[in-house]
């Protein structure tokens, strides 16, 4: 949805909205960005897929984007992930892609990929947002994760 809001002009219901739905930057975790005939979920959107498929609406001016995928994601194949990054770059956009070998859809959840994977994704997302001026300060992902795990363990007791 975030990618569609950023890339698909027909998503805005009214062209004169005072508040745009276009984000300043995109941090995408396993996005389904190909709704075309060969893409995920096409049968549900056959009448309007061209209007909502980010892969088919790549153009210059898309916000800086970082994408995280598992190589075994069954919703979006790696070939599509790489083609998306290539087309984004060719259009003059920033698109950083991180593919995690051996992992499937939703790998970044702490319950699926574990704490190390969870923190790796957050650290890379944080660095991306710092690089583009949306975050400042020192990265505290590990400390934050440790405190959250401690809180959850305390609640469970």
Regions found by a protein language model. Give the residues of each.
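Solvent-exposed loop/turn segments at secondary-structure junctions
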Residues: 32-35, 71-75, 102-106
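Short beta-strand/loop motif that positions the catalytic acidic residue
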Residues: 61, 66-69, 73
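Loop/turn elements at helix/coil->beta-strand transitions in domains of secreted/extracellular proteins
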Residues: 22-25, 62-65, 91-96
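Conserved alpha/beta-hydrolase "acid-adjacent" motif
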Residues: 74-83
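Primarily recognizes the serine-hydrolase "nucleophile elbow" in alpha/beta-hydrolase
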Residues: 1-60, 141-153
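C-terminal catalytic histidine-bearing segment of alpha/beta-hydrolase fold enzymes
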Residues: 82-157
